[in-house]
């Protein structure tokens, strides 16, 4: 088994902790920034929900399962395991006894052009203030809302 670890500078200490736990359990791991050409079973993303959103913003790869890990007291929606609990989940990872939950991404078009896919929300505003814009919200291709305003979240 091989696992990528995605972290930011603020989570480097946590990344070292995760790497040590994985090494101690015979699981190969390396920085997710060095994934190119390597086969991995999943990617561990540090930094809570923000870290998960940053990962998907920077990598557009939605094919690999990710495990979001938070370092705070509260678990999030996208990162549901706390760093303090990670050691208890290693065996589950090793035996691949987990289920992958598909989280739908939002597709956004501005002036008919696709922009980056997003996870849970998007804000669209004019580059000039107080400009009226026309918005159409479609869910699975079906129009559910149409309005004018100075922006939309």
Please annotate each region the language model reported.
Residues 1, 38-39, 62, 71, ...:
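Residue-level preference for short coil/turn positions at secondary-structure junctions
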Residues 72-151:
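Catalytic core of DAGKc-family lipid kinases
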Residues 55-71:
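A short, gly/pro- and small-residue-rich
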């Amino acid at each position: 088994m091989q696992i990528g670890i995605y972290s930011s500078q603020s989570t480097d200490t946590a990344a070292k902790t995760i790497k040590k736990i994985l090494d101690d359990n015979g699981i190969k791991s390396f920085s997710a920034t060095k994934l190119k050409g390597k086969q991995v079973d999943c990617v561990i993303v540090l930094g809570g929900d923000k870290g998960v959103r940053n990962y998907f913003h920077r990598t557009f790869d939605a094919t690999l399962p990710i495990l979001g890990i938070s370092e705070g007291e509260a678990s999030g929606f996208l990162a549901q395991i706390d760093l303090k609990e990670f050691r208890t989940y290693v065996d589950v990872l090793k035996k691949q006894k987990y289920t992958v939950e598909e989280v739908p991404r939002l597709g956004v078009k501005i002036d008919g052009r696709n922009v980056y896919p997003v996870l849970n929300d998007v804000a669209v505003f004019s580059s000039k203030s107080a400009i009226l814009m026309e918005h159409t919200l479609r869910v699975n291709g079906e129009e559910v809302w149409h309005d004018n305003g100075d922006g939309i979240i």
